Regions:
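Non-catalytic C-terminal accessory region of glycerolipid acyltransferases
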Residues: 132-277, 488-496
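Short amphipathic alpha-helix that is part of the acyltransferase structural core
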Residues: 297-350, 354, 360-363
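Conserved N-terminal entry element of GNAT/NAT acetyltransferase domains
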Residues: 271-311
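Conserved nucleotide-cofactor-binding alpha/beta core module
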Residues: 93, 98-131, 136-138, 142
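Acyl-donor binding region in acyl/amide transferases
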Residues: 325, 335-338, 370-528, 533-543, ...
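Membrane-anchoring hydrophobic helices of lipid-metabolizing enzymes
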Residues: 1-78, 85-87, 94-98, 114
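Carboxylate/His-rich catalytic cores and anion/metal-binding grooves
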Residues: 96-103, 348, 354-380
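A short helix-loop-beta-strand connector motif used in the catalytic cores of GNAT acetyltransferases and
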Residues: 343-352, 514, 539-544
Length: 578
C-alpha cells in the first residue's frame, strides 16, 4: 500500500528533502508503524499517542447531553488545521459512533479515515465541483439522522492585523443552511491552541504557503496539550426565530467564541467595606418617611412609593445613597465609596420604594424636569451631560422631557417583580400629574459582570435595531465603547432585533444572563438608544443613553403603569388615539 503521507516525486532524494522540510517525514514514520486492520477510532488513538499529544476537556459534562440519535451538528473553531479534527473525532466517537467529519481532502487520503472523514478540496481551482460530492454526503448523513463535525471557517485560522490576534476566518453559511434544512441539534466546541509564528507569517504572504506548512504544524506538537471547551447543546428551537442561514452561522460562531470568553472574563468586584446605617436608626428613618405623606404617590400592601425633593429627605437620602452602592457593587459596578451620592442629588427629585414592614428602601429612581434644571443650572446640571457630549440643540430636540437615572432595586427585592412595577407606577403618576411632559431619557447600565463579548454584542445589536437616529448628530459619548473583535455580520444583527433571541445569545456568552431587565423594560416602551458610553468612574460600566417618547409607547403598556384613568387623561392632553 502506498504511504499517503509520502510525496510521489522523482528523484527520490528531492522528495525526501521536501518531506523533511515540510514535516511529512515524521508523519510518514508514524504511518509506517501503525497497527494494521484497526477501526478509525483505534487508528485515531494511535496517531494521537504517536504525535505525543494530550487533551483537556473543560465542561466535559456537556458531552453527556449529546443525543444518542438524530441529526447532530458539532461546530468548532479551526486554530491548528488538522490536529483538532483528529482529537475531536476521537472524543466524539465515544458518544456518536455514526460521526462524520468534514475536513480537507489531504486527511481523507489516509485509508483508515475514509469511513470517518468527508473530504473537501481547499487548494484546487476547481474546488467547487470536487466538493459537491462531499457536501452531498453530509446532507445525506444529516437527513438520515447522523452526526457531523464541521469547522465552518473552512480553513485554518489566520493572524488578523485589524484585531492583533489569531482568529478564524469568516464562517461559511453552509452550517446555517444545514441547521435550517434538517432542524439539527447543535453542539459548539472551542479549541484553544495556535501554530508557530512562522506559520502565520507565511499565511500573510500567501494562503497556499500556509497550507503547505500544515503537515509540519501537525508533526511538531509533541508534548502539546489541546484544551477543548464543550458548550451546551443548542436545540433547533432556540434559533427558530433566526431565519437567515448566515445569521444562524454567526449565532453559532458567537456561541463558540463565548466558550473562550468564559474562562477569560472576570467581573471586577469592589473591595471597600460599606458602612450601613446602624440598626438603631431604623426607627428614625421610619419617622422621617412618615413625615413625607404629602409626597406619597402609591400605597400597595407592604410598600409605599414616594417622590420628594432632596431637601426634605434627610436620613432617607443617605439610605438611598447607601442602598445604591450596595446594589451597584453587587453587579460589579459601584463607586468604591461607602455610599453612592454626587453633586446632582441636591437638585433632583427622588422617587423611592419604601418597605414599611421591614423599614427599608427597596428601590429608587432619580427624577429631574429637564427645563427646570437647565434654567437653573444650565445643561451641565443634567447628570447625563457628565457621560455624553451634547448642547441645547439636543435638549430642544427632546422637547418636554424628564431625566431619569441612578435607578436600582435593592438585592433583597430583585426577585419580586412588584418592586420595579411599583416604581414605574410612580413614574406614571408623575407623567399624569405633570401633563406637559412626554419624553423620558437617561442612562441605563450594562455592568462589568457581562463579558466583553456580550457587551459588544449588546451595543451592536441595539444600535443596529433600536438606534435613536434623529439624535445621531446631536449627542456622542465622552468615552465610546470600542468593539475589539466583531465576528458577526449585519445579517445576524438585524435578525436579533427580536429581544428574545438576543437574550438567548447573551446567555450563551454569559450563562444565566440575558439582556439587562431595565433595557428590556425600556425597549418594551418603544425606547431608542442614542449611544453608549464607558463610565470609568463607575467600574467601567457601559451606559446606554435611552430615549422614550411615551406618546408612541403602546397604549396597553402605558395603561399598565399609568392606570386606565391616568392613561385616558394623558392621551387626551397629548391628543393621541388609542
Amino acid at each position: 500500500m502506498i504511504n499517503p503521507t509520502r510525496l510521489q516525486l522523482r528523484p527520490r532524494f528531492l522528495a525526501a528533502f521536501l518531506e523533511r522540510v515540510f514535516g511529512l517525514r515524521t508523519l510518514s514514520e508514524i504511518y509506517e508503524q501503525r497497527p494494521l486492520g484497526v477501526n478509525p477510532k483505534d487508528f485515531l488513538s494511535y496517531v494521537i499517542d504517536a504525535l505525543g499529544v494530550s487533551n483537556t476537556l473543560k465542561q466535559e459534562e456537556n458531552l453527556l447531553e449529546i443525543p444518542k440519535e438524530g441529526s447532530l451538528l458539532i461546530v468548532a473553531n479551526h486554530p491548528l488545521g488538522g490536529l483538532e479534527g483528529i482529537v475531536l473525532a476521537n472524543e466524539l466517537l465515544k458518544y456518536r459512533p455514526d460521526l462524520k467529519v468534514l475536513t480537507n481532502e489531504l486527511l481523507r487520503r489516509i485509508p483508515e479515515l475514509k469511513e470517518l472523514f468527508v473530504g473537501v478540496d481547499i487548494l484546487s481551482q476547481r474546488a467547487s465541483k470536487s466538493n459537491f460530492a462531499g457536501i452531498k454526503q453530509i446532507h445525506s448523513h444529516l437527513r438520515s439522522g447522523g452526526a457531523v463535525l464541521i469547522f465552518p471557517a473552512g480553513m485554518v485560522a489566520t493572524y488578523e492585523r485589524e484585531y492583533g490576534r489569531v482568529q478564524d476566518r469568516p464562517w461559511k453559511r453552509l452550517v446555517g443552511q444545514l441547521i435550517k434544512r434538517y432542524q439539527c441539534v447543535t453542539l459548539p466546541i472551542h479549541v484553544d491552541g495556535r501554530n508557530s509564528t512562522v506559520f502565520y507569517a507565511a499565511g500573510m504572504i500567501h494562503p497556499r504557503l500556509r497550507t503547505i506548512l500544515l503537515p509540519r504544524q501537525l508533526s511538531n506538537k509533541n508534548g502539546f496539550n489541546l484544551t477543548l471547551t464543550i458548550g451546551r447543546i443548542i436545540p433547533s428551537e432556540e434559533i427558530r426565530l433566526v431565519r437567515d442561514p448566515q445569521a444562524i452561522t454567526d449565532y453559532l460562531r458567537v456561541s463558540t467564541d463565548a466558550l473562550e470568553q468564559l474562562s477569560l472574563s472576570v467581573s471586577k468586584k469592589m473591595t471597600h467595606t460599606i458602612k450601613p446605617i446602624p440598626v438603631n436608626n431604623s426607627l428614625q428613618l421610619e419617622k422621617e418617611v412618615e413625615d413625607l405623606k404629602e409626597f406619597r404617590l402609591i400605597e400597595h400592601d407592604e410598600f409605599d412609593v414616594y417622590c420628594a425633593p432632596y431637601d426634605r429627605l434627610g436620613l432617607v437620602i443617605e439610605q438611598i445613597a447607601i442602598s445604591r452602592e450596595i446594589t451597584f457593587r453587587d453587579v460589579g459596578e459601584g463607586t468604591g465609596f461607602s455610599k453612592d451620592s454626587d453633586e446632582f442629588d441636591s437638585h433632583y427629585l427622588h422617587l423611592f420604594l419604601w418597605d414599611k414592614i421591614n423599614l427599608k428602601i427597596a428601590g429608587a429612581y432619580r427624577v429631574g424636569f429637564v427645563d427646570e434644571i437647565v434654567s437653573t443650572h444650565g445643561v451641565e446640571g443634567l447628570y447625563s451631560r457628565s457621560l455624553y457630549r451634547y448642547d441645547d440643540s439636543f435638549i430642544t430636540k427632546l422637547g418636554a422631557a424628564i431625566e431619569m437615572g441612578r435607578s436600582f432595586i435593592h438585592p433583597d427585592y430583585q426577585r419580586r417583580s412588584v418592586s420595579l412595577n411599583l416604581l414605574w407606577r410612580g413614574i406614571g403618576r408623575i407623567l399624569v400629574s405633570n401633563p406637559g411632559y412626554h419624553t423620558l431619557f437617561g442612562s441605563v447600565s450594562v455592568s462589568r459582570e457581562y463579558s466583553d463579548l456580550a457587551r459588544s454584542l449588546i451595543v451592536d445589536v441595539l444600535l443596529s435595531n433600536f438606534k435613536a437616529r434623529e439624535f445621531s448628530d446631536l449627542v456622542e459619548p465622552l468615552t465610546p465603547h470600542k468593539i475589539k473583535n466583531r465576528v458577526w455580520t449585519e445579517r445576524m444583527l438585524s435578525e436579533l432585533a427580536n429581544v428574545k433571541s438576543l437574550g438567548k445569545l447573551i446567555g450563551r456568552c454569559d450563562p444565566g444572563k440575558s439582556l439587562p431587565v431595565l433595557l428590556r423594560h425600556y425597549l418594551a416602551l418603544a425606547g431608542k438608544i442614542a449611544c453608549f458610553n464607558v463610565h470609568a468612574n463607575f467600574n467601567d460600566s457601559l451606559e446606554g443613553l435611552i430615549i422614550v417618547d411615551t406618546r408612541i409607547t403602546a397604549p396597553k403598556t402605558l395603561k399598565r403603569f399609568m392606570g386606565a384613568e391616568g392613561h385616558q387623561r394623558f392621551m387626551q392632553i397629548h391628543k393621541l388615539q388609542g
